[in-house]
UniProtKB/Swiss-Prot annotation:
Record domain DH: where: 194-373
Function field: Couples tyrosine kinase signals with the activation of the Rho/Rac GTPases, thus leading to cell differentiation and/or proliferation.
Result of changing residue 554 to D: Abolishes transforming activity
Self-association and partners: Interacts with SHB. Interacts with APS, DOCK2, GRB2, GRB3, DOCK2, SLA, TEC and ZNF655/VIK. Interacts with SIAH2; without leading to its degradation. Associates with BLNK, PLCG1, GRB2 and NCK1 in a B-cell antigen receptor-dependent fashion. Interacts with CBLB; which inhibits tyrosine phosphorylation and down-regulates activity. May interact with CCPG1. Interacts with CLNK. Interacts with THEMIS2. Interacts with NEK3 and this interaction is prolactin-dependent. Interacts with ITK. Interacts with PTK2B/PYK2. Interacts with HCK. Interacts with PTK2B/PYK2. Interacts (via SH2 domain) with SYK.
Residue intervals of the SH2 domain: 671-765
Keywords: Guanine-nucleotide releasing factor, Metal-binding, Phosphoprotein, Proto-oncogene, Repeat, SH2 domain, SH3 domain, Zinc, Zinc-finger
The protein's name: Proto-oncogene vav
Record's comment on post-translational modification: Phosphorylated by FYN. Phosphorylated on tyrosine residues by HCK in response to IFNG and bacterial lipopolysaccharide (LPS).
Tissue expression pattern: Widely expressed in hematopoietic cells but not in other cell types. Found in the spleen and lung.
Occurrences of domain SH3 (ranges): 592-660, 782-842
Segments forming domain PH: 402-504
Domain Calponin-homology (CH): residue ranges: 1-119
Amino acid sequence: MELWRQCTHWLIQCRVLPPSHRVTWEGAQVCELAQALRDGVLLCQLLNNLLPQAINLREVNLRPQMSQFLCLKNIRTFLSTCCEKFGLKRSELFEAFDLFDVQDFGKVIYTLSALSWTPIAQNKGIMPFPTEDSALNDEDIYSGLSDQIDDTAEEDEDLYDCVENEEAEGDEIYEDLMRLESVPTPPKMTEYDKRCCCLREIQQTEEKYTDTLGSIQQHFMKPLQRFLKPQDMETIFVNIEELFSVHTHFLKELKDALAGPGATTLYQVFIKYKERFLVYGRYCSQVESASKHLDQVATAREDVQMKLEECSQRANNGRFTLRDLLMVPMQRVLKYHLLLQELVKHTQDATEKENLRLALDAMRDLAQCVNEVKRDNETLRQITNFQLSIENLDQSLANYGRPKIDGELKITSVERRSKTDRYAFLLDKALLICKRRGDSYDLKASVNLHSFQVRDDSSGERDNKKWSHMFLLIEDQGAQGYELFFKTRELKKKWMEQFEMAISNIYPENATANGHDFQMFSFEETTSCKACQMLLRGTFYQGYRCYRCRAPAHKECLGRVPPCGRHGQDFAGTMKKDKLHRRAQDKKRNELGLPKMEVFQEYYGIPPPPGAFGPFLRLNPGDIVELTKAEAEHNWWEGRNTATNEVGWFPCNRVHPYVHGPPQDLSVHLWYAGPMERAGAEGILTNRSDGTYLVRQRVKDTAEFAISIKYNVEVKHIKIMTSEGLYRITEKKAFRGLLELVEFYQQNSLKDCFKSLDTTLQFPYKEPERRAISKPPAGSTKYFGTAKARYDFCARDRSELSLKEGDIIKILNKKGQQGWWRGEIYGRIGWFPSNYVEEDYSEYC
């Protein structure tokens, strides 16, 4: 048996790889094993399976999403632990890049083989490998693997089923504490009986939980005050006293409501206490550091350790330590919506059901808020790791927002035209360009994304040539710019998507709707959205705040916030004047009578225009420039690029006079339908696959064209505007012909022009339908039921899934971070907040 297959078998025996993982399938390749291991998560779990607590998994990033920085950190943690706790020699270890870049996967197999022969591993009773004489480094098998590895592959969620979950441990402690005395159940329970059980469980678990908070205060806080400093007490117990006070009152009102006829006022208690439960925001954001500080104090001081054991004995006969009990409040606040969900299910009266659903929504919102606090704590840990590794950084990285992507690239700039190897960290607000020095990074430049835009450039791309895939990062004023080069086209696409997402977070759609000026903002206190009244989630940059009136809002709610009360009274008039001024400027340009020029050589601001002139004008070959200032004896002209509507200066030797070419014969193309009405297009496309399209000549105006495309079960129509010999569907970009326009949108999503149309032009309507569905259909993905979106949700990251109210989402799994599910809609896959959807919604219609 090949050595890598023996290694796979050993990893399965060690309970690291699932027995059914695709690496075990017939026809599996070694690159699939490399892909499974290269983020370092499973390797760290392997050491813990062989030697419990060998690695503190809180120091491991369990969801690195192929961030090179985080993956390498995980791999190096594995390697150092192999030496320190398993006795492997340095010569037996692979280098971190041998795995991450798959430069020498044979050496990785060699290290795992050496690990399998260590006494610790053999004590587990698992057969080491190789079990027969085999070559430990088969160059034929392992050579060329780096070219087969996919840097853009999505995480295989099933892989992480074998990874320890601290949340699951906390859940077990909670369940043990809340276990109810068994009550005999009737042989056949009615819906009324089930409802009574739900009500009883809500009351009894609340009583037990409030007792637990009281026990922490009575048996741990008070005795430890004589041993610990006030700051230690505050760090460890956070606001437990406040939680106990809130729940003492909550329990009283809960009992009063349950004692009433039919418990019809129960929902009011939960709605009332949603705001009071916001004290959990502080607790949940600090409980992890509280546990860590408790461990440090107990390790450093034997008297404290002994006192903790004594307190535990008095509180619960030693069953639960203080560290165990500190996890319980986090678990409890995440259970209310589950308890109410069961109660809703078994409530028959329509009015009661609707009222309880209001309470359910309130508790779901609270749970999601808590989950986002936990998620942001993980994000802040990542940011801290970045911060500690970057030298010359003069401010907190958290000020730049959430990390988007990081990795190696090549770069050129206005100052330095030769390609330079760099390592970049992209966050919401900035790109940090660094030089890698071993395990640390030297900051070379910080690019503030507020004043930059991204522009694709595929002119020099070659599929088989690495580092030829490039896009531009250009300053709005043209004084500075960068060319960013990537190893593969897929990697470039991934980075471009993250740049676009970051810029859309800075300048979201509807940021200036209704007179507002919304900007990303970190709220110190837990805050509700002005539009939907749901909580803003997380611990930093939770949403947006209007610069003028201070109104808070979710990204997806910006267009629904009531009008701003703080902008100038002549706000609308100013906008109208600006519009009229622009029209007058356009008319003036047309009356000058200057010729149009065609670009034959690109220009991106190098060399820059003379200082007294103004901003440069970006030019691409084929662009048409309408001159506004031009004199034959001057080398610099001013003009408007009709493809982008930008105005600026450029060297006159990059253009020549524009000459209209002969009309194109469109009938040869499989997408061209000739003269056709909307109804005719709908008749053709209605029963075709999503993504099928045609281009038609408009019957009412034969000089105009339109695209008709099937998307999301509907036929959409897009008008193609023509003027000055150019074709466009948006003011941002123009083309010299229909063919160029169609070819561009075959490769680029229409969402850049129409937010709700996230598709390319995929299948020309004249192609046979069988070819149009030759790709694996989206429906072939295994899913576990569906859910209906109850609210809009706007993705903040390329891993998230934007939703519109009413969307039906296929649920792919619920195993991710708490409060987030993975789903598919319209062929797009990503994560979304579970409280924004209603699962099996048909039951509640």
